[in-house]
């Protein structure tokens, strides 16, 4: 009996050890399961975060412009208030905005920087109101009437006789023209990636629909190719022009010229709208509805041909005519003596701009003749120009801000600068 008791004791101890071991294994397993369950939410959160980031990459944010918020897929009419005269009775300038549902570039369209140039106003209206924001990738901002002052007066200029397109990017403490330019440029134009500034001829002149572009810049060359069959004229912008200020800021910009001032020309407007529609399609901002496959004439050189005497100008050519060297473009006749002289084409080319029939003085710029170049020649020249700048270590500098005292004073540049006869932009 004494032997049986120790044996039973040993058996009980062995069973107890087995139970303890099993409990320890169960505890370890439970701890592991708990650890796995703690990690699972983190993994789920990480996966969810990655998915949100992927979705966010294609999410279009609301557009903040002129103190307002424009939701994706909507069209809004905002108001820009540049009037510095009497704030209490200032008239805001309408700004049309189509903000797309899909990501894409921002395109700015400006018209009537010169108040008597009406064709661009109608181009902006037609294009903006045919856009469907729900089907648009990116944003189109249209300012149909920049120079509301000149528009009301039927004048190219502001009421103080200054040419607004000679004061960009402007200065907040400068003249009235400089302040207006500063407001437009900083509040609207600088918020965009591309700019098309719409103009017409001036001073009783009309222009074949065309782009004015600095073809020495490769990015401008690439942009100009997006307008379908519209003629392109190499034209580096002058100081103070909106196009010049935009390019300095890194905004790819061109000027579109079409028709003449103080008139609405349906054919010129249609041509311009077609070019802008083609631009949107080539920038992948909307699906192509039609393809403008016409070849794009490019003119790297152009010259205004002037009248040799005063008198009555009567043209024998029309816009876009191809002319040969020695061909008569028009005649100028003295209305009293009946003596006249012919205006002769100095080389082969195309009529890009011309004066309407009128009384002219000797030296009057009557016909702008363009000398055509191939697209390959233009691209090669632009690439060479860019490479030459890089080889010489050229790095564009930030444009210096106008000196406050110069802008605020009556310095010569603030006086009304008369536009050159051979430049209508």
List the model feature ranges, each with a label.
Residues 22-425:
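Structured catalytic-domain cores with a bias toward divalent-metal coordination
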Residues 1-23:
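Sec-dependent N-terminal signal peptides
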